[in-house]
Amino acid sequence: MTRHTGHYVLPFEQLRMIDVDSVGGKNASLGELISQLTEAGVRVPGGFATTAEAFRDFLKANSLDTRIREVLDALNADNVTDLARVGAQIRQWVIEAPLPSRLEAEIRTAYATLSARCGEGISFAVRSSATAEDLPDASFAGQQESYLNVAGIENVLDRIRHVFASLYNDRAISYRVHKGFAHHDVALSAGVQQMVRSDLASSGVMFTMDTESGFPDVVLITASYGLGETIVQGAVNPDEYYVHKPMLAAGKQAIIRRQLGSKLIKMEFADAAHGSRSVRTVDVPLTDRSRYCLSDADASELARYAVEIERHYGCPMDIEWGLDGIDGRLYILQARPETVKSQSSNRQQRYKLKGHSKVLATGRAIGQKVGAGPVRLVDDARDMERVQPGDVLVTDMTDPNWEPVMKRASAIVTNRGGRTCHAAIIARELGIPAVVGCGDATHKLSDGIAVTVSCSEGDTGNVYEGLLETEVTETADGPLPPLPTKIMMNVGNPQLAFEFAQIPNQGVGLARLEFIINNNIGVHPKAILDWPNVDADLKRAVDALSRGHESPRAFYVDKVAEGVATIAAAFWPRPVIVRLSDFKSNEYRKLIGGSRYEPEEENPMLGFRGASRYVSADFAECFQLECEAMRRVRDEMGLVNVELMVPFVRTVGEAAAVVQLLASHGLARGSGANADGSGGLRLIMMCEIPSNALLAEDFLQHFDGFSIGSNDLTQLTLGLDRDSALVAAAFDERDPAVKQLLARAISACRAAGKYVGICGQGPSDHPDLAAWLIEQGITSISLNPDTVVDTWRSLGGVSAPQ
């Protein structure tokens, strides 16, 4: 018995989550949203639902319950051919069966009431809601059908029968067997909901956590033009937005990262000229593809809805939304518990490639694992049976129909799709790495060749030539010994920040800008500033990279700010020390346009780099771009845990000049402090030249502390080129001369009451050096992420000086 026993049809506003047994997870959740969150400003289109009781009585009235049970009991669901035959037979039985007169009458009455409330010209979506769907331990992602832009009661009645039939889709039957659900225990509720005119605007899916790492403090929004089915199906590569929950709550500009998708097609309402089709797919104009389909204001509003919904449900949520192109408002269309990352254990497996080879294809990484095997190229769904255990499935796009064979694959690679499409959801649930939205994977990868599919390197997934060796380490949460020194982390790639932030740490001792400039921008800053007065080839390259941004200059600042903000948000509120760019001239030359602007130096390691660049008139305008990005991260985004570090300061005069230059760009020491004095900007200097340690007291007059760069300090103390294999054996940070300078720098900072940390490679490679540094009284040790836990444990019991 349920509280709605005896009812065949119920309006959404009468439903709550306790009604899952009556109307399934999807429809119960719509009722919960309407009845409980409308006052919080969350808008949900109205509608009604048929009940599980109505579905079961429909089957009984047509003697379908026993017939269906008999054929399913005899079915081997692993036999794809038999599965397709039996599924088609059952669906035909259901579609051809008449609805009981009482059920039809109640649907007609509910439809008339809803139509009167919505007004003329409104159409409806008819969607499925299984009684075992969207529960925290199962995802029935897209297994039953949805029908869009359905108008008129006769069409609604017909689509409800088709929705009932979709409980017996091949993928749904297979999934129930795989998850251990008895077929007769699952019933179907049909939801009839007013359509939002997102065909005239945009729509998408959002999660209240990062889908790959499980990081909880962001909302991930995907968006594309038109109806949301193209995203859910994986037919488009959507735009992506990350919104930081703590800064959203603080009223700051909380969008920390955006990624422009290709958005090649969109689904829109079809008109009468298209016959019986209610929707159609059309190409998106090139100008629209080149811009984001959602404003920052709308992305922030969606994130606020997401936070309210998550707070109400008390768990991470998977939410579908639509922007109405007529009234300009945002609507929530569905909300269900996230079913993969929120269920994972506290033991973390980390995959790392031990080598690399030629990259054959790239796309969006799903999961964080590595898979390898022979490519199985499948152009047509009818050929999916060719996929054998251990194959790498490569196809244009997968939908949930492929689920019976997806679980055989060692990895999945597609041309189309984003991180919230059905294929991505199923791949995560099965624990299979997938690279989606490659664009050209089916052309770049030949059937039968051996490849390695890596999702372990951040947001970008790579398909490598050949079978590469992979290292898998497993860490479990557990207590770490208290230390007198903070253990921090070196982070270069913002795409890995959400994952790294979940390793025990006390902040970031070194966040490098070089990775952001190299990988997220790729263009020399002078080429950006000289645009459009550059040669045709360079202009084309800059135009292509800066699509979706107001200008190439805005693109550069946006991308630096987003990269830094992603790291700062991941570790909030712990300190994140960001080192300003320290490219050498040979490294700047490798950027697009770099050879036009950079000198060819004999020894760039000792050349035009660090603070010398910043204060040079030749580079001043380029440095201004970095400063603008840093100011945005702290002032507009509110991430005042960002501290700035100046590298390679040769003289005390240079130190004074660079601090004055930063102040002129709005980055003065102590600026941006809160009313209580907290959050003021700290400026840290890299102590990496012998002169820095020898004249430490003089340098410290201009900075709030030192971060020791042991790599450069060692090579400059011992006269070694650290890039030369000929003298590599002599490179050792534990050399007495180096340790004397380390001790000198640490003691000077302690005497001045200022911060002193180390961010070089030494402590990661040599735990004995880390222990010695603690004994000297160093404030923090910043380690590579893969050495943090082991080094921390090994240092238990080491004492600092009193």
Report the location of each language-model feature:
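N-terminal beta-alpha lobe that positions the nucleotide/phosphoryl donor
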Residues: 1-191, 200, 289-297, 302-305, ...
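Alpha-helix C-terminal capping segments
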Residues: 33-36, 210-213, 408, 424-432, ...
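Acidic, glycine-rich flexible loop/linker segments
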Residues: 65, 326, 337-347, 360-392, ...
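Conserved alpha/beta-domain cores
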Residues: 111, 119, 123-125, 130-140, ...
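Extended active-site and interfacial segments that coordinate phosphate-rich ligands
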Residues: 141-174, 198-273, 333-364, 408-415, ...
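Conserved metal-phosphate-binding beta-hairpin within the catalytic cores
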Residues: 142, 314-339
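Conserved catalytic alpha/beta cores of large enzymes that bind or transform nucleotide phosphates
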Residues: 218-318, 323-324, 361-368, 389, ...
